[in-house]
Amino acid sequence: MKRYLILMLLLGLLLTGCRKQTQPEQLPTAETIDTQANTEPAAQTPEQTLTLGMIDFDSEKSVLRSMIQSYNFSGAPFRIEILNYADGAESRADAVTRMTTELLAGNVPELLDCSDLSGAQYAGYAKNGILLPLDGMPDAELLSGILKPCYVDGKLYSIVGAFALDPLFGPAEKLGASLETSVEDVLCGAVPNVSFFWGGEDLLSVYCRHAAEQYLDYDTQTASFESEKFLNILTACAAVSSAAPAPDSIMQQPMRSAAMYRSMQISWYQQTGGAFRVLALDSDGGTAYQPVLQLGVCVGSAMREAAEEALRNMLREDFQLTIADAFPVNRAALRELMQKEIEAQKAEQQTAIREEGRVEIGEAGDLAFLFDEAAADDLMNVLEHADCRSCGNQEILKIILDEADAFFKGRKTAQEAAQVMDRRAALFIAEAG
């Protein structure tokens, strides 16, 4: 009996063990996966940040900062934060030294503000592997002349997304359409009763601030001040004495936008009774500009592709239309902004007519200058031919004026002075690069 009870107990334990065996793991069905996906909260992708290195001394880059702020509010996938090398610096020279030291040490931001770099510095950064060659930029949609100084050895190393026009200009009735008349035409007396506001060395200084970059080749590290064109300019400047400005003088004034251009045309008309037109820097046309938004990508950044994408986004028409305090480079955006100025002109014109009790639709009283389609086309032609970056390199300007002074005072011939300019400028470019 005892043996029977023991056997029954063992049988019961065996059956219990069989019931407790682990069931095989079942793979989730597609329906189960969908259910889980709908019930679990989506993972949040952290916002990624790109750093933009710049030198902003005394808050001179407020327009650029405003553009970066607009970009950050545009819904772009990458936010841009500013690294100001001037923070804590006692002078601009200290800030430049700090930036150069950091870049050469490999401590680079994703993006670099290139608008302050001289042509020699820019070429040096490109040739020494600090700036990345840019591919896939929408060149066909942009003003081609603006990008010309951005190339080094045939490769694009930065983009200009916004700029200020930096023209020489004078009376339309004497100059014709913009860029029809050149600086040399005025200097040689081909335009009667029109002269420059400056004379002698001052005139040469103004000309070189606008046009000196045309005579510098950073690819070959050479200069061409001994060219016939520059020798003609140099000789003509020496013959122009400083005198009281004539009523029809050539003037200079940077213009940041179509709105500012229209405002200046109105002021010019109120003072002279006519419009102004832009003078070409040489017989081939062209005028000067100042970059406001000019950015490159640093080779040493781990986020190069994201930085390049940010630059492409800045060239898109939708972002370019948000630029208010500079000229955009996107042609479609430029045309649309000019059309807004045409409409604004019409609205102001109608207001003036109502206030003065007149009914003539075509008159604008003291508003005078009519910014219409023809005026917009003339301005667009100037912008299409803006291809010479203004020269802010004080060392280059000093070289030119030093040697020109020797010519003006009779110690050298024009050609001798130009030869020394070429040698000194080439040496400076080589050392700076």
Residue map of PLM features:
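C-terminal motif of bacterial Sec signal peptides marking the signal peptidase cleavage site
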Residues: 14-17
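Short, polar/charged alpha-helical segment
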Residues: 58-79
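Extracytoplasmic "Venus flytrap"/periplasmic binding protein-like
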Residues: 77-142
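Hinge/lid segment of periplasmic solute-binding proteins
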Residues: 115-167, 273-281
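Helix-loop-helix "hinge/cap" segment bordering the ligand-binding cleft or interdomain interface
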Residues: 135, 148-246, 297-303
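Extracytoplasmic/periplasmic substrate-binding proteins
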Residues: 235-312
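Conserved C-terminal helix/tail region of periplasmic/extracytoplasmic solute-binding proteins
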Residues: 348-433
